[in-house]
Structures are given as structure tokens and as C-alpha cells.
């Protein structure tokens, strides 16, 4: 399948999904199916460009949760083995170029596991996204090592402290109020960011037990 065919298929799927959503208003179903449509497009592009199976292609953040909103960034991590080939790096660049053709903003990182750990240590947003990772294609063994390593490196008290500081700073931008003529339903108090923080906190009882 050529890139123009992949793009047309994806855009047609999005149109059908939008019409179905307006008829059914089932947000959970929409986000799940839209994420799967994005997966299909990504897989077709990976096949088109011939990316090596040595690389793990990972969905992160909302996309990793299979909650890909229609105009949200398509967030991907290209996870590299230690002995990555120059050819693979070139192919990744070609893949990223084709992904932009889908009409979505592509947020991406290209890292080895050690580099992921370094980034997680200095960037709470990146660390959060890494905790919501899902393998799309490629090196499953490398992905498992990455997931286990990220999980083991997680300092829960430090993580939640940083998340709540991040939340407080975000709330200050909106005067700590959810009331506005044009509320920001993603960033403002009580919005999607706060909902996601709550879901992260309650998602795994074992994590709660560790910090209680």
C-alpha cells in the first residue's frame, strides 16, 4: 500500500468514526476505535518504509492508553537497541515524515532505554507518558525490558509529589477556578489532566500500598 492510499484509508475511517460518534455519542468506543485506526496506519507506514524489527515502536501517553483524541498529538517512542544500525535511524526519519501525512501532529522521541531513564528523571511529563506505554510493532523483548526498567526505577513518593506540584502550577494559570466563559477542559481545574492524574493514582492498588 502506498502512502497516499494509507492516508486516504485513515481519513475515510476518521470520517466514518466522526459520523458514528455524533449519532451514538459513545466517547469510549470512539477513542478505542480511533486508536486502533491510528495503529493500522502506523503499521502500514512501518511496512512501507521497512523498519527493522530490532526497533520497538511504542505508543505513549493518551495514545498508549488507547485514548487517541481526534486532534491530539500522535505520541510515539522509537525504542532503540544498543547496537542500533545507521540504516534504522534513517528509516525512522522516513517513517516520521510519512506519519505527518496522516494529518495529525506527530510527537516522537528516538531513544535507547538508558536515555529514556535519563529523560524520565528530569521530565515528569515524559515519565508519565512512559508509564502509559503500549507496544505497536517491533522488538517485544526490548519493550519488556524497557517497561520493567521504567517500573523499577519509579520512585512513587517523588513521582506523586512532582505530579501534584505540576497540578498546582497548572491550576494557578487558571486562577484555581474551573469557572470561565471559555473553560479549558483539558488543562483547567477539574479538567482532563486532573482526571488522568486521578486515574493514574487509583489504577494500581500495589502502587498505592507502596506510598501509604
Give the residues covered by each predicted segment.
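Single conserved hydrophobic/aromatic residue that forms the stacking wall/gate
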Residues: 201-212
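Conserved structured core elements
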Residues: 11, 32, 36, 71, ...
Amino acid at each position: 500500500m502506498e502512502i497516499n492510499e494509507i492516508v486516504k484509508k485513515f481519513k475515510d475511517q476518521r470520517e466514518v468514526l466522526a459520523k458514528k460518534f455524533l449519532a451514538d455519542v459513545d466517547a469510549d468506543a470512539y477513542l478505542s476505535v480511533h486508536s486502533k485506526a491510528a495503529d493500522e496506519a502506523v503499521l502500514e507506514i512501518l511496512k512501507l518504509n521497512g523498519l527493522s524489527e530490532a526497533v520497538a515502536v511504542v505508543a505513549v501517553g493518551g495514545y498508549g492508553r488507547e485514548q487517541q483524541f481526534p486532534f491530539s498529538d500522535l505520541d510515539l517512542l522509537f525504542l532503540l537497541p544498543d547496537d542500533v544500525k545507521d540504516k534504522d535511524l534513517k528509516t525512522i526519519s522516513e517513517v516520521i515524515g510519512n506519519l505527518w501525512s496522516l494529518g495529525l501532529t506527530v510527537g516522537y522521541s528516538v531513544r535507547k532505554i538508558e536515555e529514556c531513564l535519563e529523560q524520565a528523571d528530569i521530565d515528569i511529563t515524559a515519565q508519565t507518558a512512559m508509564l502509559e506505554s503500549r507496544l505497536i510493532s517491533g522488538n517485544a523483548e526490548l519493550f519488556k525490558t524497557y517497561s520493567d526498567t521504567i517500573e523499577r526505577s519509579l520512585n512513587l513518593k517523588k513521582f506523586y509529589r512532582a505530579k501534584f506540584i505540576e497540578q498546582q502550577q497548572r491550576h494557578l494559570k487558571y486562577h484555581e477556578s474551573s469557572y470561565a466563559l471559555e473553560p479549558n477542559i483539558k488543562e483547567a481545574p477539574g479538567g482532563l489532566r486532573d482526571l488522568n492524574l486521578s486515574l493514574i493514582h487509583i489504577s494500581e492498588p500495589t502502587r498505592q500500598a507502596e506510598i501509604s
